[in-house]
């Protein structure tokens, strides 16, 4: 489902606004939605997980301003699993950083005809990352992620760079290694001058819940 409301209202659980429920596919399920709003409506980029093949691809749903689906199309499919299609804009160009840990690397895609046509721009890191997000923080770019190494449900790392396209030779820094402060659950949110990072709760099982964490620097300039 999808609803429009301020983050502060959602946090306080005071919203009475209705949820618009989207059509449910029969042979797959949707997961990991990322939303782009524009004057004509909303685009939702998401994982389309084939139940029989047990493999995800990336699909976009186009909605009008009444949140009715007007079109949908599969936009990325590979021989390996894709999910978590984090999308961002830089210098007027849209980029996508889908989770491709099964391929032992993370690949950055560039949009050549929004929102349907994407081409591979470069391998951002030759590591099996999961749920990576990329954003500007202060005067640098931050790549925030977990690793598919058995610790992905409880540890989060980050790297910083002067460029959103160069992270290969940067230092890996541990953001958190404790229950509830875990792998990303979506894009960073800016609310009231603060940065909020949604994270997944996976203490007893995967998909247990979600929480919101304030992202800030300590006195030594380290993110936490």
Please provide the spans of the model-predicted regions.
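Carbohydrate-active catalytic/glycan-binding domains of CAZyme proteins
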Residues: 1-224
